[in-house]
Amino acid sequence: MSTLLLRLAGPVQSWGIDSKFEVRRTENAPSKSGVTGLLAAALGIQRNEDISSLNQLRLGVRTDQEGRLLKDFHTAHSEKNSYITTRYYLSDAIFLVGLECEDKGFLQKLEYALKHPAFPLFLGRRSCPPEAGMV
């Protein structure tokens, strides 16, 4: 069994799993679905494409720095309406994520993709870019 380690750090992160409508919450650590989305973006997998190849990964998360919960009062406008949302982020948090897989070649492919991503990478939400040196 081989493992690929990722250091997830950035000014803000948001790992929402029950975010709906006006309130967008975050978990205290990266979610498996959030990390899967990050990996899919790195690999260039489109939203409508199959991501089952990522199901073979086992995930573990270590919190190296908890960070602080940040609340953002957010307004957005369309032609007809204004929307007010409250979004929560983790500020200055650092996590070490371990991805375990029996297929070492697949982990090497992921490592390359994370160093040369097909799409921009984010820590949960589009407004959350990662620091350099994730892998």
Locate the predicted segments by residue.
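Short helix/loop capping segments that flank catalytic or ligand/cofactor-binding pockets
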Residues: 15-16, 108
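Internal, well-folded beta-alpha domain core
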Residues: 64-135
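Structural motif
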Residues: 12, 58, 94-96
